[in-house]
Amino acid sequence: MLRDAWLVATKDLQIERRSRVTFGQVVPFAGLVLVLFGFALDANRPVLLQATSGLFWVTIMFVSTLAVQRSTSIETTDGARRALLLAGIEPPAVFVGKSIAVAVQLLVVEIVLLIGVVVLYSADIEAWGLVFATCLIATVGIAAAGTLLGALVAGVRARETVSYTHLRAHETRPY
């Protein structure tokens, strides 16, 4: 199974390398979101510095929806999902492989965004090791949850409207 997952991940990463969607569309979008947040809160510099980590993760969530949508569309547009099944690759291997590919793409975007946060917001990061560990763990979780959500809504016509907020809207909240 791990070999098949690795094959799916390398396939998705090769497609991404050829199409350059992450660097051509996703990274500029993420940078634009950071700049817009900076304009929105620049009048109150202390608030911007306090909100930097939250703005970083909100931007990552926006970017993750784009990355997951792209990963899912690769399989659904030309019937690649059926080809993978006919090739004998099990669905869990496809899930793991796609999660790895999305996680790698998100890690690249997070590195660029960290540089952007330091440059644009003058953020002072005290514990780089903790930041990288948090990014790694959160990225694995976001990629796995996003890939699962993408697989669940792959056949739905209005799949673009299904997002993380829809899943969270039905959570029970203790008051």
Predicted regions and their residues:
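Membrane-interfacial helix-loop-helix connectors in multipass membrane proteins
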Residues: 40-51, 115-134
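Long, hydrophobic alpha-helical segments
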Residues: 52-68
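Transmembrane helix boundary and interhelical loop/hinge segments in multi-pass membrane proteins
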Residues: 16, 65-85, 99
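Conserved small/polar residues in nucleotide/adenosyl-binding loops
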Residues: 165-166, 170-175
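Short helix-to-coil transition segments within interhelical loops
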Residues: 83-91, 170
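Selective transmembrane-helix segments that form parts of the transport pathway or gating/packing helices
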Residues: 91-118
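Aromatic- and glycine-rich beta-strand/loop motifs that create alpha-glucan
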Residues: 1-26
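Hydrophobic alpha-helical transmembrane segments of polytopic membrane proteins
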Residues: 132-151
